[in-house]
Amino acid sequence: MPLVNYTEDPLHVLHPKDGAAGTDRPKALLDAVEEDPDPLLKLAAAHVVSSQQFSRDELLQLFRLAAQYETTPALMHLPLAGKILISAFYEPSTRTRLSFESAWHRLGGAVMSITDPKSTGIAKGESLADIAEMFNNYGDVLVLRSSDGEAAHNMLENLRIPLVNAGNGIDEHPTQALADVYTLAKWRPELFTGQVAPESRIKVGIIGVPSRMRTVRSLLRMLSLFPDAIDEVVIISREDENFDPGQREELEEAGLSLRLVHELDPLLPELDVVYINAIAWVGDTFEAMGEGLKLDRDSPLKKDAVILHPLARGDELSTDLDDSPHNWYFAQARGAVFVRMALLTTVVRRISAVMDTPEN
């Protein structure tokens, strides 16, 4: 490995590989979306379990606040000081857990972290209802990840603090969808503000299985709030059964145009956005899906297409794309911190500390 002269280039290690860094794009998003605190006030003290529960206006204001955090470090004047986040991850995680904990720390709060269910009362057979009662006494927000698709729902009845679902089995991952769509909103803000001409709408390709992958399920539901921005969503999958009963109908009734194909490369020249995932969590392990559906530097991508990936990746996404302009997946991971900061600020009723317009 060649040596780097840090005297000549002291910020060398801070140079991101992708081309989506900097503040120009979040600033453009700020310019495109007028501040309105009212939609966010509706989320105060709310549980966040599904991407289905958000409105279009709520998303736009969350994205605007995230862009403020991303462009204005001075805005982070510790609005969550004195607040405690319970970070309960009963399923393996690196990015999501650290992203939430980073978001909370940046806002001045303290974190209590659980990363091994064997170290909790669950290992002794304690019920989720009793655990929820204990969480009420220890923290101000619970971020929960579990391989049990019903865990988040089962805790709600006994929780008096907001719960944020960080992934529940194969069901949903709503804050990953927030990070995904926030990335697209920075890429092309006009798509999400109703200012896009029909001929400028985008075609999105999603490599994954909507019925088995929580990231894909949540993303599709969130995209369905912006059908006027999307010409078509193409699901690329080798599976025979890709949708749960009623899932496709729900999305099409919301206005999304859906198509299913089995081969990737013939479609790539048409796609403006390529979203790729190959992991579906099942129980305490995962299934690798989509064998043969891979992206690398030789893939026939559209010149200005962007690639998104929720990470962690395997060989479905080659590292030789990391230095290409198609790489928006690192920006996606960076932006996840800011959009989670926006969401957490909202659910703990601290909007008045960071928005120009005070709460009512």
Predicted regions and their residues:
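Positively charged, low-complexity intrinsically disordered leader regions
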Residues: 2-98, 358
